[in-house]
A protein has these predicted regions:
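Short beta-strand elements
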Residues: 256-260
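Nucleotidyltransferase catalytic core that binds NTPs
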Residues: 1-230, 237, 241-252, 262-264
């Protein structure tokens, strides 16, 4: 595995590759990341993994500062996976002329997390666009854990006629049901138990929600009783259009954002 921080050096190694896969990350690797990387390796001739904590996508400075990262630990976790290139750029490598404030993304940005995190998805689309322009991968691998983000990037790539294929990968969960996430390291043991109970509550009531045997407000009240003080939203939506499903099918998900102390 070659570890590269300069984009020009990376380009020298990869510019001839025709079947290049790319996994963008912000580090703090867990089994979810490793699953993305393994899938990329299995489908592509060469694999590039990046670690870059994208400052512009954070709405609060303190969230950026406390984001967990340990490069040495991350390298150890993937060194035996047959990754070809690990790209570790700094802020100037990615934003030599500053951020693009005029980037246009789909109306999906106004829903769910976009309503509460202004500019977040524009910043995500901007950095993904910059990475694609540098690496020019045939495929880019993103997790379905961040479903709204995945749909926005899919739409952005299609709208801008970018040749890279976006591959959505299944969510990997811990034994307690929680999706593997770098943010989980910020939770206490008791908070993880609450998060696990919420996941199980949603799974148990998913069919009842779509059939309207139980309301979202009833679920919201149950979650509040578990000790959650703030819920930004809870919705059941078609996963492709992010609208309320108009017919009974399996093409929907429950979307929720809530806080456990200061962790969202």
């Amino acid at each position: 595995m070659k570890i590269i921080s300069n984009k020009n050096n990376l380009i020298k190694f990869i510019y001839r590759e025709k079947n290049l896969g790319f996994v963008p990350t912000m580090g703090s690797f867990h089994l979810g990341h490793l699953s993305l990387i393994k899938k990329c390796i299995s489908q592509c001739g060469k694999t590039v993994v990046s670690i870059f904590v994208n400052k512009p996508q954070f709405n609060r400075k303190k969230d950026y500062k406390k984001y967990p990262h340990d490069i040495k630990k991350d390298i150890n976790k993937i060194k035996n996976l047959k990754v070809d290139y690990l790209y570790l750029p700094n802020l100037k490598q990615i934003y030599p002329k500053g951020i693009n404030k005029d980037i246009q993304i789909s109306s999906f940005k106004k829903k769910l997390c976009g309503k509460y995190r202004p500019g977040h998805f524009e910043a995500v689309a901007d950095v993904i666009d910059r990475f694609i322009n540098i690496i020019k991968p045939k495929k880019i691998y993103l997790g379905k854990k961040d479903m709204q983000q995945l749909k926005i990037i899919e739409h952005f790539v299609k709208k801008n006629h970018i040749k890279t294929k976006v591959v959505g990968c299944k969510t990997i969960r811990e034994k307690n049901g929680m999706a593997y996430s770098s943010r989980n390291t910020l939770l206490s043991h008791d908070e993880k138990i609450i998060a696990s109970k919420i996941y199980k509550l949603l799974v148990k009531n998913k069919k009842k929600l779509i059939s309207k045997y139980i309301s979202l407000n009833q679920i919201k009240n149950k979650i509040s009783k578990l000790g959650v003080k703030k819920i930004d939203y809870i919705n059941i939506l078609d996963i492709n259009k992010l609208i309320k499903p108009y017919q009974k099918n399996n093409n929907y998900k429950i979307f929720i954002a809530y806080y456990l102390r200061s962790t969202r």
